[in-house]
Amino acid sequence: MFKTSYNLYDLNYPKNDSLTPIRDYKNDYFHKNDDKLPEIVRKPTRKLSKHENKLNDKKFTNKRPASLDLHSIVESLSNKKIYSPINTEIFQNVVRLNLSPQIPNSPHEGCKFYKIVQEFYLSEVEYYNNLLTANNVYRKALNSDPRFKNKLVKLDSSDELLLFGNIDTIASISKILVTAIKDLLLAKQRGKMLDANEWQKIFTKNEVQQQLYSTFDISEAFEQHLLRIKSTYTSYFVSHQKQMELFTTLRMNKNHFFNKWYEYCLKESGCIKLEDILKSPMKRLTQWIDTLETLESCYEDILSPELGLKLSPTRRKYSLFSNKLETEVSEYKSNSMYNFSLTPSEIIQSYDEDQFTHLLKPPDKQNKNICNASRQESNLDNSRVPSLLSGSSSYYSDVSGLEIVTNTSTASAEMINLKMDEETEFFTLADHISKFKKVMKGLLELKKNLLKNDLSGIIDISLRRINAWKKVIECERPSGAFFAHDNLISTMCSSYIDKLHEQKNQVTILKLTELETDVMNPLERIIAHCTTVKSKLKDLQALKKDYMLFLQEKKANVRDIKRDLLGMHFQNLQNQMKRELPVFITLIHDTIECILLNYIKVFLKYLEIIAGGKKYLQKDLENMSLNDSIATGQIKNLDILQCYSKSRYMTKRMVRKDWPFPGDPSGSRVVRKLFEL
């Protein structure tokens, strides 16, 4: 007899992988009027002990089933109505209790999967080493070798940064991926090398594959890699076209130095071409997607279902990223002025930012602190200049030239505030007054020169000349072959005069509208404010004598209310001028900068008008591009030279053969000078 509180069934409790059903499964579980429906099972708030679980389940184990035939369980459960009180999903899971994970029966089943992993691992290592070659061989020779230094591109220039882009960052990210896969394969055994022997163990040993079955989460490594490459590869993809254009330009324009540098680097790198390295990131994304697709097709029985099913979402994420890259590259090509390195908030902020604030350099006195600030400002001004090809000037071609101007503008604004603080601390009121007088004198001189500048002067000179020539042409002359084309010439003169009058009208409108509104009116307002400040300075100078008397009386303990009021007024006015005059001078510099920029815009429009308008400028550009497309050695403005030579030849022939006046034309000194007889 057993001395225990458990009955015999409790001692003989079935093991986990067997099933003890509560009744015969071939009969209905319940009927419509059944009064023995199961109670709602509530989850306990605490973990029950093993003994309590057995006691709770005892009522289900007392009645043994009539049959233990379990073949029709799945079919009967699938035919069960959906509103059945039995949780069929849980019951189906109970049928397959704690099945042991299916692992490769032989190492050959996992060999194909890990062969693919090996190929990808070795290709990623090769990709990483090739990227390092671009920096350690090509870039190093370009910067360090005296034979090539500053010959092709300048050190740390934007052209150099565009040529090599952010390859070093891409290489470091690939190294992280290689390290992650290595740690997964070696079960994070530090210091161990993934050599040929380790690969052979992975291919042949069943124990190693069983260990990797539930630990080799390669999809997680790819997921982390995708997070790292998004911004880096986006920047590289959108600048790749300009990168290759710069490479071609250097090869064409600096052929001698380029060939020497390229030949030397080919020998050092083992004949790895730079253009192949630069194109490799563009192809690598497709290779990652293909690798994930191949791994997804053969992971069964090699990885656990939890790890294997993660490969498909990872591959879809890479495909979406690839499509997004193609879209952004196409948008970048269609709108080259768009800067992909800026965030939306930075783009919105840049609308109101002045790109030329870094040009502001207000005059100041020479002192130690100001010199230091000037040196810092000069260092900012000597920063990298944006490339014409790249449109970008960041270290990784990830930040555009616009962003450098913005950063320089911010730094310059901070430098101005620093100067204002130093001026307040070290400069006296007399220094500020002296500077203000110079500034006001310069403003008056600027206004005088702008008023003196007659924009219509060039057109008036052209009108006087063409009118004089027209009078010469239309003077009374005898009929003859020499004057056969006089009507045509007269018509051309008239049309040219009409064109000049139209240009003069456009210039007059430009002068009365944009020049007056954007340049002259703001300048006059600044001068008016300066006049107000100048009057206050005169008041300050007039009160100075009374203030001196006030100080003397105060020292002698003599009180005069009038003197006291004048003295206090002088002190307040003096403090106000010392506090506000430096700020006002800085505002003058800011305003004058905007005025000059507006004047430049107006002057560019003026040049466009006197050049003949946009149509003529467009024709000139087309002619220039046509001349550039023709072989080198083509003479510029050949059409003008040909027209001039033809006209001169025809005129000389008319003078020699069809001279309508009496006498030999070579006998006249004027005719000989004009027509080189």
Swiss-Prot record:
One term under GO cellular component: cytoplasm
Taxonomic source organism: Saccharomyces cerevisiae (strain ATCC 204508 / S288c)
Domain DH: 112-326
Modified residues (Phosphothreonine): T20, T88
Listed Gene3D superfamilies: Arfaptin homology (AH) domain/BAR domain, Dbl homology (DH) domain
Entry keywords, A to Z: Phosphoprotein
Name this protein carries in UniProt: Nuclear fusion protein FUS2
SUPFAM superfamilies according to UniProt: DBL homology domain (DH-domain)
GO biological process terms, semicolon-separated: conjugation with cellular fusion; cytogamy; karyogamy involved in conjugation with cellular fusion; regulation of actomyosin contractile ring contraction; regulation of division septum assembly
GO molecular function annotations of the record: guanyl-nucleotide exchange factor activity
Modified residues (Phosphoserine): S67, S72, S84, S100, S106
